[in-house]
Amino acid sequence: LREIFSLPSPPQRIEVFDNSHISGTHALGAMIVTGPEGFQKNAYRKFNMDDAAITPGDDIAMMKAMITRRFRGAETLPDIVLIDGGEPQLNASLAALKEAGVTLPVAAIAKGPERNAGRERFFMPGKPPFSLAPDDPALYFLQRIRDEAHRFAITSHRSRRSRALAVS
């Protein structure tokens, strides 16, 4: 990962961000943390996206709001931030980090054509989009942590939606 993302050393803390909603309802952002010891579930976070300023279903605005909330006044910083999304989500995340006064390596991972696993495209500031070889072990690791962020976001969204339905 150090070489892939031009990091000064192997990352000890990686934070991965994803959004979940159904047509903008019960919108939620999720952050997972991983490192050499594996997933650090006690560091996972959920971000309720009930902000009236965010248009329901606007994944880009949701990502920016989540990154802003995570890094405003943050004491613990990751070695790299991975965003589940493409170039628009990457740009929103970079803008949020800049507003928070935080400088970190950031990359976005988007599923490839037809959303096929193994054809992911990576986006980084100042670099053209790139892919990794389908048999690259780093690709498998990055898919796994992206999928864990997605799982956590979906599970949290379903739980939030179920609670809302139980109340109504």
Which residues make up each language-model segment?
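Acidic, glycine-enriched active-site microenvironments
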Residues: 1-168
